[in-house]
Amino acid sequence: MNTSRLFSLLFQGSLVKRIAAGLVLGIVVALISAPLQETIGFNLAEKVGVLGTIFVKALRAVAPILIFFLVMAALANRKIGTKSNMKEIIVLYLLGTFLAAFVAVIAGFAFPTEVVLAAKEDSSSAPQAVGQVLLTLILNVVDNPLNAIFKANFIGVLAWSIGLGLALRHASDATKNVLSDFAEGVSKIVHVIISFAPFGVFGLVAETLSDKGLVALGGYVQLLAVLIGTMLFTAFVVNPILVYWKIRRNPYPLVWTCVRESGVTAFFTRSSAANIPVNIELAKRLNLDEETYSVSIPLGANINMAGAAITITILTLAAVHTLGLEVSFVSALLLSIVAALCACGASGVAGGSLLLIPLACSLFGISDDVAAQMIGVGFIIGILQDSTETALNSSTDVLFTAAVCMEEERKNAA
């Protein structure tokens, strides 16, 4: 096999297939490491585990600067003044994202899930009262921006990026272009890091299973079931309720159409941005207002992130349960609000929702090391989790757009 063929095999093609291959190879290495240890003189799984360590370290390094530039550029470049019914669509987007996070909080408490993590004892204690959580949140918000980036204070990074983004909305086009270029540059770096995800998953799975045994897979299966179950509940219960609120008739024909023609495609592309043409074509077939959907669907690909909010919430609560921390429901409700707000920063970035887990974990005093391990867990289950998340996000874009347009038609016909 020549060098170019090997490079193509390792770094090109479907990322889902390569991660699946890394997952399978990691399990195989974990199973054969113990029998081979006496023969080769070392534990093979522990040696390849360094690949997972490097991968998680790279993710932790790029996450603060990624959030800073992406959010700032998105807000600075957002056009001021839109069609009046855009407000209703944006309200649906934000309300749907929050309700998804709220449902995830309920699911996280109803089906507490633990996963196997290393160095559980390194985590700090969670605040006992919501007042302490809020105080910590405020102190993190007013942190020095450079210190926030340097120490990975994600709440401080998010606060400063939002503030600067809003302040720069009236800046010159040249300034906005520079911000967009920086955001694009950081996104490309993230893309390179994500391309190594199969190696990272390989190392993480091999080391975890070798150390903890196959019982570790049980936690992942339950975690995946809770995640996907919450997303399905949101898609087929929560979203139809919101649609009925708008159109005042049976919402399920519209819901099924959007899931079938938009969600299925998004499931395989795993990209809300790549699914925008599919959604626009579906909007045309539904005879929706072109001036509305031409703006709302691309906007939804950036701010309508119910799936990301669910992922952030469920994985954060999994870390809480794994560490045995006592967290009040009110504090968890605050988590749903934070998850809904920061989920917008996950758009257009491979694994973006996973990169925001440390931000949510910091609300409960969970150490950055444990949060980074939860990112690794997210990539292990990401073969199904990320696809389902994208399907929910993208299909909801056209669903809520159609609901508002149909409401306008109903009002005009009355």
Swiss-Prot record:
GO cellular component annotations of the record: plasma membrane
Known catalytic reactions: L-serine(in) + Na(+)(in) = L-serine(out) + Na(+)(out); L-threonine(in) + Na(+)(in) = L-threonine(out) + Na(+)(out)
The encoding gene: sstT
Keyword Transcription: no
Primary role: Involved in the import of serine and threonine into the cell, with the concomitant import of sodium (symport system).
Name this protein carries in UniProt: Serine/threonine transporter SstT
InterPro entries attached to this UniProt entry: Na-dicarboxylate_symporter, Na:dicarbo_symporter_sf, Ser_Thr_transp_SstT
Sequence intervals crossing the membrane: 22-42, 54-74, 89-109, 148-168, 189-209, 223-243, 305-325, 337-357
Top-level division of the source organism's lineage: Bacteria
Keyword Transport: yes
Membrane-topology descriptor: Multi-pass membrane protein
GO biological process, one term: threonine transport
Family: Belongs to the dicarboxylate/amino acid:cation symporter (DAACS) (TC 2.A.23) family.
Swiss-Prot/TrEMBL keywords: Amino-acid transport, Cell inner membrane, Cell membrane, Membrane, Symport, Transmembrane, Transmembrane helix, Transport
HAMAP family: Ser_Thr_transp_SstT
UniProt subcellular location: Cell inner membrane
One Gene Ontology MF term: neutral L-amino acid:sodium symporter activity
